């Protein structure tokens, strides 16, 4: 089992994703819970050659409140999928990790793509539904994007969804 923390980076959090405060509070609680259980926590950083998430820039770093510990892996990606050209799948296979729990952003890009690719690869995926976020866009407000993906796309199809409270209740 592993917790995958997807794209919660300084530059994106500064842009105020939906319900930023609770998103970060819940994510911190989930990370701490997994650490307390000695379950692996893996961070994913979206990377660009230039722009908001230019590799090496301050905006590219994992959000400071979620600071990875020295023993925690960080994978950098250039695509919406956490698996494409990252060595993540090989790493998980080497460690016999088959159950993945996802927190992070953005729902309609990297979370959705990674859920579906992970499903195709045979991983059992849990999404912490109150520890994922996104932004309003020209078509839909963020809360509608969240509810659409949770209820119409993922639930009982590609992943199971649990709240932070439900995850924390498990010893």
Positions of PLM-derived features:
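Active-site-adjacent betaalpha module
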Residues: 1-2, 29-32, 52-171
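N-terminal nucleotide-binding beta1-loop-alpha1 segment
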Residues: 4-7
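Short acidic, Gly/Ser-rich segments with clustered Asp/Glu that frequently serve as metal-coordination loops
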Residues: 9-15
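A short alpha/beta connector and helix-capping loop motif
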Residues: 17-46
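Short, well-ordered beta-to-alpha junction loops that form the rim of enzyme active sites
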Residues: 46-47, 105
């Amino acid at each position: 089992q592993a917790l995958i923390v997807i794209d919660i980076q300084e530059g994106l959090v500064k842009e105020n994703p939906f319900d930023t405060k609770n998103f970060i509070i819940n994510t911190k609680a989930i990370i701490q819970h997994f650490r307390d259980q000695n379950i692996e926590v893996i961070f994913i950083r979206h990377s660009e050659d230039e722009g908001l998430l230019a590799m090496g820039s301050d905006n590219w770093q994992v959000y400071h409140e979620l600071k990875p510990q020295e023993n925690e892996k960080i994978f950098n990606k250039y695509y919406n999928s956490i698996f494409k050209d990252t060595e993540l799948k090989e790493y998980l296979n080497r460690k016999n990790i088959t159950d993945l729990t996802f927190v992070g952003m953005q729902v309609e890009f990297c979370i959705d793509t990674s859920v579906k690719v992970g499903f195709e690869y045979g991983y059992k995926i849990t999404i912490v539904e109150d520890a994922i976020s996104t932004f309003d866009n020209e078509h839909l407000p963020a809360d509608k994007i969240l509810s659409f993906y949770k209820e119409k796309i993922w639930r009982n199809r590609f992943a199971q969804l649990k709240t932070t409270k439900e995850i924390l209740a498990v010893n």
